[in-house]
């Protein structure tokens, strides 16, 4: 009985130490600048923080094992379909997930969005400490909106951040706020 109690107590103490583990990484919010970074996308293009600071950008961190990410990714695909050719630059970046599992999931879902498979948290921690999905809508280098899993953003939520104005040479985006 005493051995069971000690095992139970040890387990509880281990769990508590995990809960109090110091979180690392930034905690970027609305108004913060996009950090410097560089990632190679699955299509071979390189996306940098410098590039994303020019105009409007959508940065998403995800893992395909995350149910909230799986719920959000189809909305982001629709957002990508409608706005990638109209001045919005996209960077979908995995958090601790390799190329093979993402590639399999993308194929199953018929996603066409380019992504960067990152097997560590190095890029993620420039932006956040916890939680995926995490979506940043930015304009001219500043974060203008942040979406997480509470609640999961919809296509309408993402589009609502943008105010689309017709222009002679295409579509000009002006972020609300």
Task: Report residues per predicted region.
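Thiol-based oxidoreductase modules, predominantly thioredoxin-like and allied folds used
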Residues: 87-99, 111-120
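Thiol-/selenol-based redox modules, centered on thioredoxin-like
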Residues: 137-177
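Conserved redox-active cysteine motifs that mediate thiol-disulfide chemistry
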Residues: 61-77
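N-proximal helix/coil linker or "cap" segments that precede and/or mark the start of modular domains
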Residues: 18-36, 177
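Sec-dependent bacterial lipoprotein signal peptides
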Residues: 1-16
């Amino acid at each position: 009985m005493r051995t069971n109690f000690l095992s139970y107590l040890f387990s509880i103490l281990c769990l508590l130490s995990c809960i109090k583990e110091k979180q690392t990484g930034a905690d970027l919010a609305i108004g913060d600048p996009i950090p410097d970074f560089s990632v190679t996308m699955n299509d071979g293009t390189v996306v940098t923080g410098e590039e994303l600071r020019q105009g409007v950008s959508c940065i998403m961190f995800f893992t395909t094992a995350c149910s909230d990410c799986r719920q959000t990714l189809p909305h982001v695909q629709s957002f990508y379909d409608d706005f990638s050719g109209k001045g919005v630059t996209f960077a979908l970046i995995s958090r601790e997930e390799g190329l093979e599992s993402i590639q399999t999931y993308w194929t199953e879902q018929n996603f066409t969005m380019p992504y960067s498979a990152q097997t560590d948290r190095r890029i993620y921690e420039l932006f956040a400490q916890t939680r995926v999905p995490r979506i940043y809508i930015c304009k001219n280098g500043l974060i203008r909106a942040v979406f997480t899993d509470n609640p999961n953003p919809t296509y309408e939520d993402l589009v609502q951040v943008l105010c689309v104005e017709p222009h002679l040479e295409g579509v000009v985006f002006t972020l609300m706020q």
